[in-house]
Structure formats: C-alpha cells, structure tokens
Amino acid sequence: GGILMTKQELLDFLKFNSNKPRYYTVHLNKKVLEQFAIGYYQDLSANRFIVYEVTERQQLHEKASFEREKDAIEELYEIVKFRCRIKSIPIQLDVSEIDAIGTSDKDLELLLIDGNLWLPDTEEEHLLRLQEKLNNYIYFLESKQYVERYGDNFDKKVIHITFQYSPSDNGLALLAAAQKTLQNTDMSLKVELP
C-alpha cells in the first residue's frame, strides 16, 4: 500500500520474469476471453476498471473493480506475483563500490549503474540503497580519494547514474533532491534513463 505502481513498472516486471513458465497470459486494459487470461479492462458504462481471470472453460470471473486504473494495476500485480510464485527480487546495489571511474579533458566522472526494477514492495529498500550509494560517491569526491590515481586537475566532477528501468516518482524525487544538494559545488549529477 501507499506506493502506486505504474503500467510501465508492471510491464517491466512481466518482461523481467518472462523466462518463468506461465500457463496464463496477462492483459493490461484489455478484455480477453481466452483460457487462463488474467488482466483488467475498463467498464465504461460503470466507469470502473475490472480485474478478471478467465477459467479453463473460458468463463470470465470478475475478481475486483476499482475507480482508478492504478488500483487495478496493483491488484493485477498481486495476482501475477501469487500465480508466478514470484518472490520479490532483492535489490542488487553494492553501496560500498564505485562502479567505474573515468576522466575526460577536464572532467572526472564516476559511473553508478542501477539495474534494479522499480516495484512497490522493494521500493523503500531500493531508495535507501541508492541514497547510501550516492552518499558514498559524494563522500569519495569530497574527501578526494581519487587524487592519488587521477590527480586533482578537474573542472567538474560528475556522478553519472544509469538506470536500466525508469525510476518511480519517489526515485525521481530522490535524484532531484541530490541534484539540489550539489548545486553550489563542483560536483554534478548526470542521469541517464532508459
């Protein structure tokens, strides 16, 4: 609860787990009457989003209905997770590691790679780990731990974050806050989204 899932996050989640054997199909905002389909569709007459599953005999069962599409997406996510017996994927982000360091002309660039999915049930941990890793990058620059190897003749120090999956709203808020913190320093944040 509390954190809402986007359609894109659900699609990413399904894609990420597409190697898992699935005897059913998942449909977003579409009513499909084939065996073992699960999904949600918009019932325009009732102005609601209906989450459904289709039985072996191709009967449509309404599981729940919501006013907001976001709630239908969340419900569908829970059903898919239960069906797939998918455990939440642990966040993999080594906070003590600088992923890569590079120099160009007058810039020093630290690369931070985040290949984790953004999902409601792991978002909190994801944000904490990302924040901690970012803090470590900033500390690395502030305490000039790069000098011995790269010297100290840089105009700009850039923390370049690459995301494999689009961050949630809270993820984007964290980045905006970090950018603000670095405003009057010789450090900056470069964010690369998929």
Where are these regions (language model features)?
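Short glycine-rich, basic-tinged beta-strand/loop micro-motifs
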Residues: 108-118, 152-165
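Negatively charged, low-complexity tracts enriched in Asp/Glu with abundant Ser/Thr
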Residues: 2-32
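A short, charged, amphipathic alpha-helix used as a generic interaction element across diverse proteins
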Residues: 67-82
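Short aromatic-glycine-(Arg/Gly/Cys) micro-motifs in beta-strand/loop hairpins
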Residues: 30-61, 79-81
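Intrinsically disordered, low-complexity charged/polar segments
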Residues: 82-88
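Acidic, aromatic-enriched beta-alpha/helix-loop junctions
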Residues: 59-61, 124-147
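N-terminal, charge-rich interaction modules
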Residues: 89-115
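Helix-rich interaction surfaces within compact, conserved domain-sized segments
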Residues: 160-194
